[in-house]
Swiss-Prot record:
GO biological process: positive regulation of miRNA transcription
Protein task: Regulatory peptide encoded by the primary transcript (pri-miR319a) of the microRNA miR319a that enhances the accumulation of its corresponding mature miRNA. Acts probably as a transcriptional activator of its corresponding pri-miRNA.
Keywords of this entry: Activator, Transcription, Transcription regulation
Protein name: Peptide encoded by miPEP319a
Domain of life: Eukaryota
């Protein structure tokens, strides 16, 4: 499973960038925010439990 599919499964309610009525800037921001959560949080959690 690639990271794109993975973050869509984790944050289905935040996936707005496929909707045509959402401005591109907003959809890009939401998509980027999701990606940052998925990429950064696992590292932060891992460090916290070391």
């Amino acid at each position: 499973m690639n990271i794109h599919t993975y973050h869509h499964l984790l944050f289905p309610s935040l996936v707005f960038h496929q909707s045509s009525d959402v401005p591109n800037a907003l959809s890009l921001h939401i998509h980027t925010y999701e990606y940052i959560i998925v990429v950064i949080d696992p590292f932060r959690i891992t460090l916290a439990f070391r």
